[in-house]
């Protein structure tokens, strides 16, 4: 049975994990790191770079490097590169494809199934977009799981039978969630969740960037926001400074040649940022985490003292101010240090993949919907059918009627949110139920059913009880991708995968050819410069020279077939040269004469075979 992986598709970094012998293992990427930057870059030569290679070239390729695309999931955001439009799903799919490739290389087998995590506070459109990204990457998404739930699953499975209440405080690169879960006897049940989809480590970075821009403007009078390359360098320096301030009281930010003045003289940025100043300029961001925490405690109907364990998730929770705030909010409770905040979500996703594949037994995951769902009714009111923090999957029905006499149809507008007025919430989608027989208002019976699946994706049905006529919508309005568009993107991604494979193959062929040219050229040079002259005729060496010249010409072009052909010819000429040298050496030994020479010649029968075999093997290797 094919194995399934667990993927934490993060705003700044992503992680993939898999079960090995029942235990979750985080898979290192092809660069050797356990986390992969969620960055995609389109190089000017047509190559698509993902992860660390994309991050490495960001400064010199600002306009064609995309990061933090998770913040655009479920919106109509897109970016145009070389005349082609890319959606957030397609960019995310590139990251997923890299994680998939790295996991396949680690396991030595193809992977098609995956569990992908999302922030608990992601709405329906964002979840749908994440699932579409998985499909474009060639993955069968078994389940979309909330990140805090996955973290609790990873943390809580080995904690015995005793029922425990766990608070998961998840502050990632672009999103924030806080969730309260109960774990016991193999059941992980989410009691309540809240959060902010537009709050994360990126915002802390931005504050440092703004601080640096203001400082530089104050000393030089130059506004760096107008220089894209300078801003990219500032962002990278800000992220580094933020990380350093988690373990140091101050950090130096030194960027030479950040820009030039009016006289084209180079200018340098050199600032000292203290932890106290950093906390001062980001205090309001930290305060935004307080209300979701209070909401979760209230929604779950418990007191802070009932919390048994606090689990921190996301790299941003390493900031001392965040840890201190969590301690303050939980009445001094020390957060658990036994989990890696960067990896715990992917580990939980791998465990859930194991549950769905039957590899992990006796575990039940009960997740919740983060926001209320309902429809707009007379007066623009939001009538909720499913309240927030309802355990999913779930199904709820309610009967409505018409607002006007002889109304032939009803418009069903589906919203997600907590506001009393429908328009103030997130419109997920709308559809029409037609063919209602003429009748006074209030007479027709229209049954509206909301069905949320285990991925948190919503299906809505409206049915006229009188005629039995019904209409259904699967909410995907937020992502706006039709099945045809998704199929096209899948094909496009597959085509790019083939392009990437060809490019890697071409690079390998070029490397082999360049290596062979270098080694053969050196060998010929050594022969010509040997003491007593070359052991082989100049004619033989000239043939090798010609083959080297042909190979160099081929390497100067882009025709890989020509390079392969030239490399093959050079290999043959090299082999002929090796054979000629061997024969010349044998002839010299024979001419040496005398008993020693004869003995040497006479005792070399089996040795000849061995030496000959070694020469042939060496030549084959050089091909």
From Swiss-Prot:
<feature type="region of interest" description="Disordered">
    <location>
        <begin position="587"/>
        <end position="623"/>
    </location>
</feature>
<dbReference type="InterPro" id="IPR029048">
    <property type="entry name" value="HSP70_C_sf"/>
</dbReference>
<feature type="compositionally biased region" description="Gly residues">
    <location>
        <begin position="594"/>
        <end position="605"/>
    </location>
</feature>
<keyword id="KW-0547">Nucleotide-binding</keyword>
<feature type="compositionally biased region" description="Acidic residues">
    <location>
        <begin position="609"/>
        <end position="623"/>
    </location>
</feature>
<keyword id="KW-0346">Stress response</keyword>
<dbReference type="InterPro" id="IPR029047">
    <property type="entry name" value="HSP70_peptide-bd_sf"/>
</dbReference>
<keyword id="KW-0143">Chaperone</keyword>
<comment type="function">
    <text>Acts as a chaperone.</text>
</comment>
<feature type="modified residue" description="Phosphothreonine; by autocatalysis">
    <location>
        <position position="175"/>
    </location>
</feature>
<dbReference type="InterPro" id="IPR013126">
    <property type="entry name" value="Hsp_70_fam"/>
</dbReference>
<dbReference type="InterPro" id="IPR018181">
    <property type="entry name" value="Heat_shock_70_CS"/>
</dbReference>
<dbReference type="GO" id="GO:0051082">
    <property type="term" value="F:unfolded protein binding"/>
</dbReference>
<comment type="similarity">
    <text>Belongs to the heat shock protein 70 family.</text>
</comment>
<dbReference type="GO" id="GO:0140662">
    <property type="term" value="F:ATP-dependent protein folding chaperone"/>
</dbReference>
<keyword id="KW-0597">Phosphoprotein</keyword>
<dbReference type="GO" id="GO:0005524">
    <property type="term" value="F:ATP binding"/>
</dbReference>
<dbReference type="InterPro" id="IPR012725">
    <property type="entry name" value="Chaperone_DnaK"/>
</dbReference>
<protein>
    <recommendedName>
        <fullName>Chaperone protein DnaK</fullName>
    </recommendedName>
</protein>
<dbReference type="Pfam" id="PF00012">
    <property type="entry name" value="HSP70"/>
</dbReference>
<dbReference type="InterPro" id="IPR043129">
    <property type="entry name" value="ATPase_NBD"/>
</dbReference>
<keyword id="KW-0067">ATP-binding</keyword>
């Amino acid at each position: 049975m094919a194995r399934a992986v667990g993927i934490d598709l993060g705003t700044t970094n992503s992680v993939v994990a898999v079960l090995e012998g029942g235990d979750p293992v985080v898979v290192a990427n092809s660069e050797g790191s356990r986390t992969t930057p969620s960055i995609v870059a389109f190089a000017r030569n047509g190559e698509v770079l993902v992860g660390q290679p994309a991050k490495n070239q960001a400064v010199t390729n600002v306009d064609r490097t995309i990061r933090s695309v998770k913040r655009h999931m479920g919106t109509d955001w897109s970016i145009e590169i070389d005349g082609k439009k890319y959606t957030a799903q397609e960019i995310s799919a590139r990251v997923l494809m890299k994680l998939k490739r790295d996991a396949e290389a680690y396991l030595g087998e193809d992977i098609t199934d995956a569990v992908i995590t999302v922030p608990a506070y992601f709405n329906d459109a964002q979840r749908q977009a994440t699932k579409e990204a998985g499909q474009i990457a060639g993955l069968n998404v078994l389940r979309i799981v909330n990140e805090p739930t996955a973290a609790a699953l990873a943390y809580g499975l080995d904690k015995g039978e005793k029922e425990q209440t766990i608070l998961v405080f998840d502050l990632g690169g672009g999103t924030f969630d806080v969730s309260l879960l109960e774990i016991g006897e193999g059941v992980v049940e989410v009691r309540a969740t809240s959060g902010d989809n537009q709050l994360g480590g990126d915002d802390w970075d931005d504050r440092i960037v703004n601080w640096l821009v203001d400082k530089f403007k104050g000393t030089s009078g130059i506004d760096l926001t107008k220089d894209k390359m300078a801003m990219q360098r500032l962002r990278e320096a800000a992220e580094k400074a933020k990380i350093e301030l988690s373990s140091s009281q101050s950090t130096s930010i030194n960027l030479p040649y950040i820009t030039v003045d009016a006289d084209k003289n180079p200018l340098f940025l050199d600032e000292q940022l203290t932890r106290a100043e950093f906390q001062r300029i980001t205090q309001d961001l930290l305060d935004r985490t307080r209300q979701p925490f209070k909401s979760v405690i209230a929604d779950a109907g418990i007191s802070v003292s009932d919390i048994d364990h606090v689990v921190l998730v996301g790299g941003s929770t390493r900031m001392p101010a965040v840890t201190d705030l969590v301690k303050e909010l939980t009445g001094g409770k020390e957060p658990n240090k036994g989990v890696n905040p960067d990896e715990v979500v992917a580990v939980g996703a791998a465990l859930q993949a194991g549950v769905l594949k039957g590899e992990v037994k006796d575990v039940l995951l009960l997740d919740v919907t983060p926001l209320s769902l309902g429809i707009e009714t007379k007066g623009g009111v939001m009538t909720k059918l499913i309240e927030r923090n309802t355990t999913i999957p779930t199904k709820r029905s309610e009967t409505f009627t018409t607002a006007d006499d002889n109304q032939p149809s009803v418009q069903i507008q589906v919203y997600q949110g907590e506001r009393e007025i429908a328009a103030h919430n997130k419109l997920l989608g709308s559809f029409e139920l037609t063919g209602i027989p003429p009748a006074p208002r209030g007479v027709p019976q229209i049954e509206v059913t909301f069905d949320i699946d285990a991925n948190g994706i919503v299906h809505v049905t409206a049915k006229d009880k009188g005629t039995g006529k019904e209409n259904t919508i699967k909410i995907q309005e937020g992502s706006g991708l039709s099945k045809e568009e998704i199929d096209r993107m899948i094909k496009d991604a597959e085509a790019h995968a083939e392009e990437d494979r060809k490019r890697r193959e071409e690079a390998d062929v070029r490397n082999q050819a360049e290596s062979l040219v270098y080694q053969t050229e050196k060998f010929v040079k050594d022969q010509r410069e040997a003491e007593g002259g070359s052991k082989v005729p100049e004619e033989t060496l000239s043939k090798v020279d010609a083959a080297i010249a042909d190979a160099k010409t081929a390497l100067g072009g882009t025709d890989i077939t020509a390079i392969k052909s030239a490399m093959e010819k050079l290999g043959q000429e090299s082999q002929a040269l090796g054979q000629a040298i061997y024969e010349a050496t044998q002839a010299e030994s024979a001419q040496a004469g005398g008993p020693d020479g004869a003995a040497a010649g006479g005792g070399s029968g089996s040795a000849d075979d061995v030496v000959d075999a070694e020469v042939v093997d060496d030549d084959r290797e050089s091909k």
